[in-house]
UniProtKB/Swiss-Prot annotation:
<keyword id="KW-0464">Manganese</keyword>
<feature type="binding site">
    <location>
        <position position="231"/>
    </location>
    <ligand>
        <name>Mn(2+)</name>
    </ligand>
</feature>
<feature type="binding site">
    <location>
        <position position="206"/>
    </location>
    <ligand>
        <name>substrate</name>
    </ligand>
</feature>
<dbReference type="GO" id="GO:0005524">
    <property type="term" value="F:ATP binding"/>
</dbReference>
<comment type="pathway">
    <text>Carbohydrate biosynthesis; gluconeogenesis.</text>
</comment>
<keyword id="KW-0312">Gluconeogenesis</keyword>
<feature type="binding site">
    <location>
        <begin position="448"/>
        <end position="449"/>
    </location>
    <ligand>
        <name>ATP</name>
    </ligand>
</feature>
<feature type="binding site">
    <location>
        <position position="454"/>
    </location>
    <ligand>
        <name>ATP</name>
    </ligand>
</feature>
<dbReference type="InterPro" id="IPR008210">
    <property type="entry name" value="PEP_carboxykinase_N"/>
</dbReference>
<dbReference type="InterPro" id="IPR015994">
    <property type="entry name" value="PEPCK_ATP_CS"/>
</dbReference>
<comment type="subunit">
    <text>Monomer.</text>
</comment>
<dbReference type="InterPro" id="IPR013035">
    <property type="entry name" value="PEP_carboxykinase_C"/>
</dbReference>
<feature type="binding site">
    <location>
        <begin position="247"/>
        <end position="255"/>
    </location>
    <ligand>
        <name>ATP</name>
    </ligand>
</feature>
<feature type="binding site">
    <location>
        <position position="332"/>
    </location>
    <ligand>
        <name>substrate</name>
    </ligand>
</feature>
<comment type="function">
    <text>Involved in the gluconeogenesis. Catalyzes the conversion of oxaloacetate (OAA) to phosphoenolpyruvate (PEP) through direct phosphoryl transfer between the nucleoside triphosphate and OAA.</text>
</comment>
<keyword id="KW-0963">Cytoplasm</keyword>
<feature type="binding site">
    <location>
        <position position="268"/>
    </location>
    <ligand>
        <name>Mn(2+)</name>
    </ligand>
</feature>
């Protein structure tokens, strides 16, 4: 049997033997039948919900497993990858020997041999000259469905000459019994070989490992070509003006980039090259915990046939209880991007960005709701990737927990963070783009900055009115802040005004400044990082 040039014999080149059958780039209709088959058991089997989407469980792994991420250290990667065992920074790029890689590959190929396999050929990246052609191999129907949702679906013509640049072999059912003597973290593994151009997955069923795996690879390849690779959402206005939104979980990235006046380019992963900003993906991977039709109608409306729900609670009658986080707070849904109405068509790309927005949810109550950044401050705050959450303590007191994640996506960076900052600023300068730091968190009132005020701030950035505003400088962080903005409560623009006394703010500001300084020290082992210290806060 031959399908599009793929035969069971051809898979022997990957080390997969005696394949019973190949289901190549199956239709959504076929996947719908396959993943609900009564012959399936355990995590393989999905159930149909009243919304029309199929729901699956991913087992004990309801999120990525960063401690089980490995990269083969060889001549290709030795001097380029930002390794976990080198320099001052802690990251998830754990080195793997060629010998251990060979063993892990044998485990996965043995698991996939003799099976009926699903093969999905897809693109990562909307621009033909920089996209990755990726071949996914799995024995699980819903994992093929996830890939079909999340990556860019080739046309029939594009499939005819499809040659994979990268191969992902998902052996979720196999684990590594020799992990201890090999010095690994556990029996589970997500391993990359940049020379062989293969990703191996073992022990974890979580679909996001395939999505973020290829994002990590793009994060390795593109900056080395001078193309910015970004963990951000992006949209475009009626006049073709593009904005990108960086931010960690809970900062409002998805909410604020979803705007009825603007078309969505994408919600999570983008590149920026000589032509402009482009999406890496062909779908969205949205959180669904406490999802409601009223609060997020776009996402709720996207959950229908062909969408794939993960780790949600499905009642006996097929209804989904989105408020139930008993399996995980990280309940998700993947769906093709065309399930959202207001998107850029037919290709998820637009021109150069003129507005770059860093979102932070500062629970310390120090940072202003908005500030305009200099070029050096842009790099500094991009490298810092700060946000903070309020976490309850045993005594019932809520204390902020700071998070610093380089480039607002440290888990997915393969190169030193300063390389991403340099490429981003180079692209911004060429496009005449301006960066802003927007705090969607708290201030001295103890209340979170209202979504109304935050949307007013975003509107002022996008329509340019913030650039006409009178500015003053906030001490300690040396940030330029507006004294007034249309549609925004003027009493909140200077965070000092939200405290009973300036001294109260000053005390908190000194504390937060020291946290920034301590965190940034890890970048000073690179000359580019050391040069940026002056752009940070002063104590």
């Amino acid at each position: 049997m031959q399908i599009n040039g793929i035969t069971p014999q051809a898979l022997t080149a990957y080390g997969i033997h005696d394949v019973r059958d190949i289901v190549y780039n199956p239709s959504y209709e076929l996947l719908f039948e396959e993943e609900r088959s009564p012959t399936l058991q355990g995590y393989e089997r999905g159930i149909e919900t009243q919304l029309g989407a199929v729901a699956v469980d991913t087992g004990i792994f309801t999120g990525r497993s960063p401690k089980d991420k490995y990269i083969v250290r060889d001549d290709v990667t030795r001097d380029t990858v930002w390794w976990s065992d080198q320099g001052k920074g802690k990251n998830d790029n754990h080195p793997l020997s060629q010998e251990t890689w060979t063993h892990l590959k044998q485990l996965v190929t043995t698991q996939l041999s003799g099976k009926r396999l699903f093969i999905i050929d897809a693109f990562c990246g909307a621009n033909p000259d920089s996209r990755l052609s990726v071949r996914f191999v799995t024995e699980v129907a819903w994992q093929a469905h996830f890939v079909k949702n999340m990556f860019i679906r080739p046309s029939d013509e594009e499939l005819e000459g499809f040659e994979p640049d990268f191969i992902v072999m998902n052996g979720a059912k196999c684990t590594n019994p020799n992990w201890q003597e090999q010095g690994l973290n556990s029996e589970n593994f997500v391993a990359f070989n940049l020379t062989e151009r293969i990703q191996l997955i073992g022990g974890t069923w979580y679909g996001g490992e395939m999505k973020k795996g290829m994002f990590s690879i793009m994060n390795y390849l593109l900056p080395l070509k001078g193309i910015a690779s970004m963990h951000c959402s992006a949209n475009v206005g009626e006049k073709g003006d593009v904005a990108v939104f960086f931010g960690l979980s809970g900062t409002g990235k998805t909410t604020l980039s979803t705007d009825p006046k603007r078309q969505l380019i994408g919600d999570d992963e983008h590149g920026w090259d000589d032509d402009g900003v482009f999406n890496f993906e062909g779908g969205c991977y949205a959180k669904t915990i406490k999802l409601s039709k009223e609060a997020e109608p776009d996402i709720y409306g996207a959950i229908k046939r062909d969408a794939l729900l993960e780790n949600v609670t499905v009642l006996a009658d097929g209804t989904v209880d989105f408020n139930d986080g008993s399996k995980t707070e990280n309940t998700r849904v993947s769906y093709p991007i065309y399930h959202i109405q207001n998107i850029v068509k037919p290709v998820s790309k637009a021109g150069h960005a003129t507005k770059v927005i860093f979102l932070t949810a500062d629970a310390f109550g120090v940072l202003p709701p908005v500030s305009r950044l200099t070029s050096d401050q842009t790099q500094y705050h991009f490298l810092s990737g700060f946000t903070a959450k309020l976490a309850g303590t045993e005594r019932g007191v809520t204390e902020p927990t700071p998070t610093f994640s380089a480039c607002f996506g440290a888990a997915f960076l393969m190169l030193h963070p300063t390389q991403y900052a340099e490429v981003l600023v180079k692209r911004m300068k060429a496009a005449g783009a301006q960066a802003y730091l927007v705090n969607t968190g708290w201030n001295g009132s103890g209340k979170r900055i209202s979504i109304k005020d935050t949307r007013g701030i975003i509107d002022a950035i996008l329509n340019g009115s913030i650039d006409d505003a009178e500015m003053q400088t906030l001490p300690v962080f040396d940030l330029a802040i507006p004294t007034s903005l249309p549609g925004v409560n003027p009493d909140i623009l200077d965070p000092r005004d939200t405290y009973a006394s300036v001294e109260q703010w000053q005390e908190k500001a000194d504390d937060l400044a020291q946290r920034f300084i301590t965190n940034f020290d890890k970048y000073t082992d690179a000359p580019a990082g050391a040069a940026l210290v002056k752009a940070g806060p002063k104590r």
